[in-house]
Amino acid sequence: MCSGPRKPSTPPLPQQQKEATVMAASLLLELAAADDVAAVRRVVEEEKVSLGVAGLWYGPSASGVARLGMERRTAAMVAALYGSTGVLGYVVAAAPAEAARASETDGATPLHMAAAGGAANAVAATRLLLAAGASVDALSASGLRAGDLLPRATAAEKAIRLLLKSPAVSPSSSPKKSASPPSPPPPQEAKKEYPPDLTLPDLKSGLFSTDEFRMYSFKVKPCSRAYSHDWTECPFVHPGENARRRDPRRYSYSCVPCPEFRKGGSCRKGDACEYAHGVFECWLHPAQYRTRLCKDEVGCARRICFFAHKPDELRAVNPSAVSVGMQPTVSSPRSSPPNGLDMAAAAAAMMSPAWPSSPASRLKTALGARELDFDLEMLALDQYQQKLFDKVSGAPSPRASWGAAANGLATASPARAVPDYTDLLGSVDPAMLSQLHALSLKQAGDMPAYSSMADTTQMHMPTSPMVGGANTAFGLDHSMAKAIMSSRASAFAKRSQSFIDRGGRAPAARSLMSPATTGAPSILSDWGSPDGKLDWGVQGDELHKLRKSASFAFRGQSAMPVATHAAAAEPDVSWVNSLVKDGHAAGDIFAQWPEQEQMVA
C-alpha cells in the first residue's frame, strides 16, 4: 500500500469562529453582570477571551430616551451598569483603556452606563472609572454626557453628580503626547469650586420639593451652616446672596417685577416695595408658582423649576385671595349692615401700610383727601342711623308703659331724660310736633312761633342724651353729630314751611274750629299720651304712624274733639254754612290731603 504525505488539518471556518466569539462574549457579559470575578478571570486567562470583546445586551440606551433595546456592550459597560465593582476593578486593572471605550451602536461609555443604571454601587463604580481615567466630557451618539443620564429622585443621583463635578476629575482619560506645546485654554469666568458636601439636602426630594417650602421658605430662611459651601445647592439664604427673597407672609408684594430693580439691581423702597425684586421673588410668588406648564415637562433637568411638569401639578390660584391673607380684615358690628363699618377700624384699615398693597390699589391711584373725608362721613352717617334703629326697635311700646312713663318722667333726673331719636326719623323736638299741630289750626303767617321752635331744636340736639352718648358708644363726637343733625333739621324746616304755606291757602281751615274748641288746650296737647306728655320710647313703625296721624289732623278736627271729650262745649255748626257758601274752599282742603300724605310718607 502506498503512503503519501499527510495532509494538514482543515482550519475552522469563519462562521464557526464568529459563533464561538459571540458565545464567549455572551458568557463574559453574564459573568460581569453577576459580579463573578473568579469565573471572569478563568474565562479570560484560560480560554483566552479578550476583555474588549463586545456582545449584544438588552438594557437602557444612552440616547436620553427612557427605552430599552439591544445594544453592543463590553464587560466593563455591563459591570458599570449593574454596579459590579469586583469585575469592574479587575477589568480596569487588566485593561485601563476599557474605562473609556465607547459602544459601536449608541456611543455609550462605561461612565454613561454607571450614571444611567442607578445601581446601589453606582457611586463606587463611578469612582473606579474616574480613577482609571474615564472622561466626564465624553459624548454619546445623542450628544449627551454621563451627568445628563442620571435618573431623578434616586439616592445615588446627588453623590454621582458631585463626583462628576469634582475638580479632581481628569478632563480626559487619554492624554496624548504632542510635539507642539498645548494651546492655552480659552478664558473662562472663574468659578469657585467646593468639595462634595453630602450633608446638603436634596432640592428635588422630600420636604424641600413641596410647594409650601418653595413658596414660603426657599431662600427666605437664613442658613445655619458656619462653613463655606455651595450656595446654589443650599435651599436657605446667605448674607449678600442675590437670590434672597422676602417672606410673602410678612411683606406684601406682588409677582410683578419692580421696574427700578430691573434697571439698576436695587430699589429705593427696599423691602417696603410692592413689586418683586429678582427672578425668585417673581416666579416663586404664591400667585405665580406652578400656574403654568413647563415646556420640558417630565424631561426637565432644572434644580428649581418654577413651572408644573404635569397637569395635576398645576396650582389653582384665586386672584382675589392672593393677597390673601395679606390684607387686614375689618369686621363690622353684628347689627349693622356691611357698609356700616366702625369709624376707627375703617380709618385704621385705610391708613395701614398693607392697604396700598391690595391688587386693586396697585393698579389704581390712591383716593384723594376730599374723597376719603366724604367716605368717612358717609360711613359715620350709616352707622349712626343703624345704631339708632336698633335702639328704637328694642324700646318698649308706649301703650304698655304709659303709667310707668308718667311716674318715671316725674321723678327722673335730668341726666336720665328720655333720649331724642327725632334726628333719625326726620323729625325734631317733641314741642315742635305739638306746635306744628297748633300751626295747622292757626293763622298761616305765624312765623315767629316757628323761629323760636327752630331755636329750641338747635339748642336741644347737641345736648341730647343720645348725641352725647354717641361719643362713647358709637365713635362720634359732638361736632360730627351736630353736622349730621343740622342737615336733617334744615330739611325739616323746608318741609314744615311748605305745611304752613299750604295751610295759608285754605281759608276754610280757619273756620273749622269753634270758639269753644279753640279755648280747650287739652284737646290738642294730649293726643299722644293720656298724661299730655310725649313718650318717645316707641317702636320705629309706631312713631311713623304717629307722624302720619299728625299730618292727617286736618281731616279729623271737626269730629275728634267732640267725640273724645264730653266736658267740652257744644260744637259750633256754623261751619256747615261756610262749606255750603264756599264750596271751592272746601274742595281745596280735601285736595290737599293726598299731597300732605305724600309729603309725610
UniProtKB/Swiss-Prot annotation:
Disulfide-linked positions: none
InterPro entries on file: Ankyrin_rpt, Ankyrin_rpt-contain_sf, Unkempt-like, Znf_CCCH
Swiss-Prot/TrEMBL ANK repeat ranges: 71-101, 106-138
Zinc finger (C3H1-type): 252-280, 288-312
Keyword terms of this UniProt record: ANK repeat, DNA-binding, Metal-binding, Repeat, Zinc, Zinc-finger
Chain residue ranges for the region called Disordered: 167-203
GO biological process: regulation of gene expression
Keyword Zinc: yes
Keyword Glycoprotein belongs to the record: no
GO MF entry, a single one: DNA binding
Compositional bias per record (Low complexity), positions renumbered to this chain: 167-180
The name this protein goes by in its record: Zinc finger CCCH domain-containing protein 33
Species: Oryza sativa subsp. japonica
